[in-house]
């Protein structure tokens, strides 16, 4: 009886609410709704916090993005969105720490903060929660975009048995599907591969190494990493004949469409609030 009562209360608290134009939610109300729906216990060290703006501001629209660059902010303003939900930092460090840049009167920081302030934008980071969701909603979006839903191992969602293809063809296909303009290959680009380990963003050397050990892949696909850690490790594994090749996508491309998945997840939760997915362009391209 008590559990049933608690369940009823929870369903009322976190059920979709259609706001009218005159009673648009505040940014704080929107974020509370998101946290409640995700059901993830927040750690004191989480980076999923407001980074700029007044959370009591009423939301005219939500821009969901991989990275709140100045160009993305301008695109959000053009659409009439004032709440920016970004996966990655806004102010150039994991915790958006700005004290040093402020003390140096950094012009880039000042320009961005002024733009946010002048237009009444609110920026909230959505990084830890999506990766802790079951399944990881960022990974879900990438797997959907690649069409690999039936290819991953049930016991390890970083390991995929994929259609046999050359490394070159695989890199081209992934780049096109994920919007990566500067995909890099290490190893034999003409080698045929069918078992992949895919990690996203920047999980770090330990996580990448463990995924490789678990998956025993012939191709490793990553977002980014230090060249003296995962990159060097895989280069040595290629030299030793343990792996055929590595594909490096770039951080943004390796997670971007996961935020498109987030936008899809948010729309039924927040009816009456416009939600736009605004892609962050791959910052790199080849010089030739």
Where are the regions a protein language model picked out?
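Bacterial N-terminal signal peptides that target proteins for export
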Residues: 1-9
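Active-site catalytic microenvironments in core metabolic enzymes, especially phosphate/sugar-handling
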Residues: 20-288
């Amino acid at each position: 009886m008590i559990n049933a009562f608690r369940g009823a209360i929870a369903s009322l608290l976190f059920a979709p609410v259609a706001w009218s134009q005159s009673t648009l939610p505040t940014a704080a109300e929107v974020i509370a709704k998101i946290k409640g729906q995700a059901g993830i216990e927040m750690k004191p060290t989480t980076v999923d916090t407001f980074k700029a703006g007044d959370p009591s501001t009423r939301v005219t629209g939500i821009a969901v993005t991989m990275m709140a660059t100045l160009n993305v902010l301008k695109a959000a303003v053009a659409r009439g969105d004032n709440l920016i939900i970004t996966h990655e930092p806004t102010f150039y460090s994991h915790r958006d720490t700005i004290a040093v840049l402020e003390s140096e009167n950094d012009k880039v920081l000042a320009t961005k903060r002024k733009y946010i302030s002048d237009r009444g934008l609110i920026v909230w980071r959505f990084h830890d929660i999506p990766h802790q969701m079951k399944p990881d909603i960022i990974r879900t979006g990438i797997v959907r975009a690649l069409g690999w839903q039936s290819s991953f191992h049930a016991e390890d969602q970083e390991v995929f048995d994929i259609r046999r293809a050359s490394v070159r063809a695989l890199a081209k296909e992934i780049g096109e599907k994920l919007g990566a303009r500067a995909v890099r290959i290490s190893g034999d680009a003409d080698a045929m591969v069918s078992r992949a380990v895919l990690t996203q963003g920047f999980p770090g050397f330990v996580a990448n190494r463990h995924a490789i050990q678990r998956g025993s892949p012939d191709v490793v696909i990553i977002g980014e990493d230090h060249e003296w850690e995962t990159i060097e490790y895989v280069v040595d594994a290629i030299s030793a004949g343990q792996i055929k090749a590595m594909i490096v996508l770039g951080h943004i491309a390796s997670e971007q469409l996961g935020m498109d998945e987030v936008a899809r997840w948010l729309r039924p939760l927040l009816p009456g609030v416009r939600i736009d997915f605004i892609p962050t362009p791959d910052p790199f391209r080849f010089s030739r």
